UniProtKB/Swiss-Prot annotation:
Homodimer. The gene is trpD. GO terms for cellular component: cytosol. 5-phospho-alpha-D-ribose 1-diphosphate binds at residues 82, 85-86, 90, 92-95, 110-118, 122. It comes from Methanothermobacter thermautotrophicus (strain ATCC 29096 / DSM 1053 / JCM 10044 / NBRC 100330 / Delta H) (Methanobacterium thermoautotrophicum). Its EC number is 2.4.2.18. InterPro entries: Anthranilate_Pribosyl_Tfrase (IPR005940), Glycosyl_Trfase_fam3 (IPR000312), Glycosyl_Trfase_fam3_N_dom (IPR017459), Glycosyl_Trfase_fam3_N_dom_sf (IPR036320), Nuc_phospho_transferase (IPR035902). This is Anthranilate phosphoribosyltransferase.
Amino acid sequence: MKFRRMISEIMDFRNLSEDEAYSLMEMIMAGELDDIKIAAILTALAMKGETVDEITGFARAMRDRSPRVRVSGSHEVVDSCGTGGDSFRSYNISTAAAMIAAAAGVRVAKHGNRAVTGSCGGADILEAAGVNIELDAAAAARSLSDVGISFMFAPLFHRATARVAAVRRSLGFKTVFNILGPLTSPAAAGIQLLGVFDPQLVGPVAEVLRNLGTRCAMVVHGFDANLNPALDEISTVGPTLVAFLEDDEIRIDRLMPPDFGVEVGELEHLRAGSTTAENLELFMDVLRGREDTPEQKSRLDIALANAGALIYLAGLADTLPEGTETAKRTVKSGAALELLEEFVSYTRNLQS
């Protein structure tokens, strides 16, 4: 039996080929493996350590089997999605950054889920703001075309995610599925800003994106002021480890907040609230451009730095600081808040 051979190889610390990993994910998605077998596979892979080829095969299978959000010029579409699971429970930075970048003219296909480590994930915050997050592929494509932004709720697009959800909860440790979410954009976005929970994943995940045909990307992990791993985002409180992917070449760099055009902030200022209502207020303050207190300024600056990177990747700015400056002008003009209001109205009128 194929499963028995694969689990035996993994338990012997032998790596699967990309094709074998693809086949294994197909078995999971087709419901051919029960929870015990899925748990065994995920545990064995975590103990061995997943390779670039294995992650590529898993991601390719999930992409091939999920509904496709078909948009013209998908190579110019940007996805902003992190793995979650980092060591600090920050407010929802990537969703604020996506909204700001979209208001600046970037076509953003935001792919996300509910909270992993924070108290409010991208789906949670947009739903609380009034967005209809349960759009099918056709509706998401219309939203991207008409509004300039769409949200694709991962469980609606990836049956494998739903299939293994209970197993992942019972295992209680990170598995390859923590990495796969951001790698499986239903819009096949050609441009990506992808945050990872572990700095050791920065280079390998960039290699996976290259294997999957991503045109250009930044894979990032943010550190705190004491150089401790902290954020699956660009950091404004310490260094950011970045893998730049462009023209099939990968370059690793370590950047500081001024390299993004922002001042060094305080990590504690970025902490999420304890309720969805509190997190919605933090999110709205950022889109309003509020910086009356040091806490508000830190939250705004990190959103601007991440939005600026999206603007830079999309080719709407020549440098990262220019991207951040464009993001700041966008927020101060009120355009980000206006786009959210339009996004809410549009998605509520769409029938999935």
